[in-house]
């Protein structure tokens, strides 16, 4: 979502997909199934660019929307298993729901794409520091750990990562500004 991204770096996945026109808008009353799976759906946007979808990432609020999807006979598409948790997948590709607050549903409800085209690398050495004395504080200022009193050690590791979204030439969509291995589903009213 381009959060704290250096200005000299390339755009993130959501911005890249938006600039390429790989956006499907889910308005109130729209059929979610069609917005994902139909010819004008999010998966089709990626396939039009010559890529196969191999994964989906969505805001945790999408779980309820997907649980509510029913087939033409009224049966839920995503069935719960009493012994195992429901594994979500769309069109055979796994779906993940980050629950750490990092997914910004105001920008995208779901990101689908060819995640093999999203690469990252360590751009600077990882540095480590071992502490045997000191305190670890909570955000309110209270002390969570006093290393010396509790006979503890703390390890601090700092690493810097960089990312890239390769956009190799293909004959499916020759205009590189319109070709994108990712598409997003966003909430709102269509601008068409």
What residues fall within each predicted segment?
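Alpha-helical scaffold segments that mediate packing/assembly in large oligomeric complexes
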Residues: 1-44, 89, 96, 178, ...
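Long, contiguous amphipathic alpha-helices that act as assembly "spine/axial" helices in icosahedral shell
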Residues: 1-18, 45-57, 61-62, 95, ...
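Extended alpha-helical or coil "stalk/linker/tether" regions that are enriched in polar/charged
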Residues: 27, 33-58, 65-83, 89, ...
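Sequence/fold signature of self-assembling virion shell proteins
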Residues: 72-192
């Amino acid at each position: 979502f381009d959060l704290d991204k250096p200005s000299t770096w390339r755009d993130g996945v959501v911005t890249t997909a938006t600039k390429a026109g790989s956006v499907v808008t889910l308005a109130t009353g729209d059929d979610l199934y069609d917005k994902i799976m139909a010819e004008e759906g999010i998966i089709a946007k990626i396939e039009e660019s010559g890529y196969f979808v191999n994964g989906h990432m969505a805001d945790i609020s999408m779980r309820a929307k997907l649980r509510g999807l029913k087939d033409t006979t009224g049966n839920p598409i995503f069935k719960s298993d009493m012994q195992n948790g429901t594994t979500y997948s769309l069109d055979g590709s796994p779906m993940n729901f980050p629950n750490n607050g990092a997914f910004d549903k105001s920008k995208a409800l779901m990101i689908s794409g060819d995640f093999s085209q999203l690469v990252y690398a360590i751009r600077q050495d990882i540095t480590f520091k071992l502490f045997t004395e000191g305190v670890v504080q909570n955000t309110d200022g209270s002390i969570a750990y006093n290393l010396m009193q509790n006979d503890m050690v703390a390890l601090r590791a700092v690493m810097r990562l960089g990312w890239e979204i390769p956009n190799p030439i293909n004959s499916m969509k020759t205009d590189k500004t319109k070709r994108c291995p990712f598409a997003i589903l966003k909430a709102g009213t269509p601008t068409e």
